[in-house]
């Protein structure tokens, strides 16, 4: 389970969900664990004491002495390598030739160990991207199940991959397929994962405070592809297409018409957008001449015919961005040979995930959407463009150092007004100053709902899509969503509508 390391002494950094899972996993497989957290009494400390009673816990600022006697560092995804104390420990580990793994690396090595011990060889699908990861992961898991396979869905989506694997091992129910949602944080310390198929949905500015630069952020995303992985790529995102394989065999998706075999896209016919598959139409073409060794001339393009799969409007999840998520999930499942008919039925049945452009109420001919999970600019751009109607947007919070200027064009095109909340409201206001849209600031989310509803007209939507993290005003994005739901319910009650 630990490669060449036999029962190593492991330093686990961070005691969040992943840190606790790594400590439990290491102890289960004979390793001694030292667990360190910058908090003196993290919330998971009682669980660590209960499940790993022999673990050594050290709370407080990280110190170089944590590395004494350690053969492996297992680092939690929330800890940035740019943090001075974390960086010092990682430098110390490198100087001592101590490997640094994250939870997904431990998971990948666990699968390799199970293959050697039991012949267990599941298919693995992996999903990353700035936005849409959770929806695509949950949808891919539902499609796998609809196709008659057992499935384990884990990773960034929760539960942790190691906890889910432990549960399956103990129950004797190891799944046919693993579907993993992977964040850039998790991928940063992943080295040997070789998924059967993987996708990068999109790459837009996010987590620059953690990675330091867009180049570093994108590079972390690219670690999702192993040597044998089928790459499922958003062909309309140049940063994603930079990871196209040199030998071909990639599968692409997008909201345009596909032009290469196996690609997915949209065909608009009579005002109806259809999800279509490009199939090779080479029946009448002459057999290509044998290519000489070293010939780098690009192969002639293969003509395609477009096969209609289903109207995009038949999806229960709203917006063009969700159509692309659906195409990515479909492409991943097709890459491991699952039957198309079952997959298409699964696409029609999937109802979506909470807090992701979720319709929570409709009254007075106005719809209210909760996109509290939209914690970056790219997510809000996708939500605005995907609803295809006039929107009063509620945005703001902790901007994590993002550039808000990409909001200006979609706000000008789709928004009737923008109500701003939170710490970075002034920065968003400055970015939208020339959009020609009314900009209003509110002290609380409850007040923002009132301001937004007062400006919405019949047929409009009020959209909470903050483009920011929530921690300046709320415990987390779920708490922000809860406050939004309660404020919308109170507004409805004031207007004589019970939700």
From Swiss-Prot:
A GO MF term: ATP binding
Keywords assigned by UniProt, alphabetized: ATP-binding, Cell cycle, Cell division, Cell shape, Cell wall biogenesis/degradation, Cytoplasm, Ligase, Nucleotide-binding, Peptidoglycan synthesis
Catalysed reaction equations from the record: UDP-N-acetyl-alpha-D-muramoyl-L-alanine + D-glutamate + ATP = UDP-N-acetyl-alpha-D-muramoyl-L-alanyl-D-glutamate + ADP + phosphate + H(+)
Gene3D superfamilies: Mur ligase, C-terminal domain, Mur-like, catalytic domain, NAD(P)-binding Rossmann-like Domain
Protein EC: 6.3.2.9
InterPro entries per UniProt: Mur-like_cat_sf, Mur_ligase_C, Mur_ligase_C_dom_sf, Mur_ligase_cen, MurD
One of the protein's GO biological processes: regulation of cell shape
Pathway terms, separated by semicolons: Cell wall biogenesis; peptidoglycan biosynthesis
Annotated binding of ATP, by residue: 129-135
Residues spanning the membrane: none
Principal EC category: ligase
Chief subcellular location: cytoplasm
Domain of life: Bacteria
UniProt keyword Cell cycle present: yes
CC per GO annotation: cytoplasm
Pfam families reported in the protein's UniProt record: Mur_ligase_C (PF02875), Mur_ligase_M (PF08245), MurD-like_N (PF21799)
Function: Cell wall formation. Catalyzes the addition of glutamate to the nucleotide precursor UDP-N-acetylmuramoyl-L-alanine (UMA).
Protein name: UDP-N-acetylmuramoylalanine--D-glutamate ligase
Native organism taxonomy: Bacteria, Pseudomonadati, Pseudomonadota, Betaproteobacteria, Burkholderiales
